[in-house]
Amino acid sequence: MDKFLKTVDRISELSGKGVSFLVIPLVAVILYEIIARYVFQNPTIWVHETAQMIYGAYVILLGAYVLQRGGHVNVELLYGRFKPRTRAVIDLVTWLLFFYFCGLLLWKGGEMAWDSLLLGETEPTTFAPPVYPIKMMIPLGSFLILLQGLAKFIRDLTLVITGKEAAHEH
């Protein structure tokens, strides 16, 4: 089981670090627009949508990495005062909602991405970029976060049953 948990953590870490490089083209296209608009008085028709798509992929694909690092929003008012085992019991209950939501996102997002691909869907703008690449990020990101959620669930279950924490890689 430790090998599975470490593999999932490694996938989340590598995907997160890889996806973090999307900031470079994001900044580049925005900088290009600033220069084109304010220096050359020649704004583009493509930067806004391109930046949205890059940022969308960035946010969707970083979910698993952020989950692995414990970076998602948490209500700490009472939760932080509980012992680790009690927190794990609470987390086991909330994981059920997590799996439902992310499973639904994977399923419906996958359908939406597939339909978009088959239709060759494009944005209804002058630039008209294809939409399916960004829509494909939804099921991919959902799968990655589900996988990391499963690893967290197993760790919480192990803590509740044995009183000992399972191995973490970060």
Please annotate each region the language model reported.
Residues M1-H170:
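Alpha-helical transmembrane segments and membrane-interface helix-loop junctions
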